[in-house]
UniProtKB/Swiss-Prot annotation:
GO terms for molecular function: metal ion binding; metalloendopeptidase activity; RNA endonuclease activity. Its cofactor is Zn(2+). Belongs to the endoribonuclease YbeY family. Binds 1 zinc ion. This is Endoribonuclease YbeY. Gene3D superfamilies: Metalloproteases ('zincins'), catalytic domain (3.40.390.30). It comes from Mus musculus. The keyword Cell inner membrane does not apply. Disulfide bonds: none annotated.
Amino acid sequence: MSLVIKNLQRVVPIRRVPLRRKMDLVRSILGVKKFDLGIICVDNKTIQNINRIYRNKNVPTDVLSFSFHENLKAGEFPQPHSPDDYNLGDIFLGVEYILQHCRESEDYCDVLTVTATHGLCHLLGFTHSSKAEWQKMYNQEKLVLEELSRYTGARLQPLSRGLY
């Protein structure tokens, strides 16, 4: 199904074609290509507002995920009952925040891909609220990014690396 990437900010230039290409590969690796996915790029002010409203945290952040299928357990796939259910949800990328925290040696597009992959894992029920949950999420991210690296030649590391 479709992957929609919307750029709703003007602070950071976004190259949507490489991000789309990589995220299409990530969706294939995860086996969720038949589901719709939205990726929305926003600035610090917008991501902070969303973070305040939905998480009670009045600070900008790198990624927020809003799943269409609530209560999925880590690694479960949604079970659509109608054509409208073929939707994973939306990932908001705080692209200004991501750029501000991007190391000089890192490729910004690669960091966006890693961050979006992290968000996609959240849409599939993975969390990092406890060490055990984090380990599952880290392993999933690592597996996906290693496979993606085989296609792209990049050496991508999970966003959740080092959380515990």
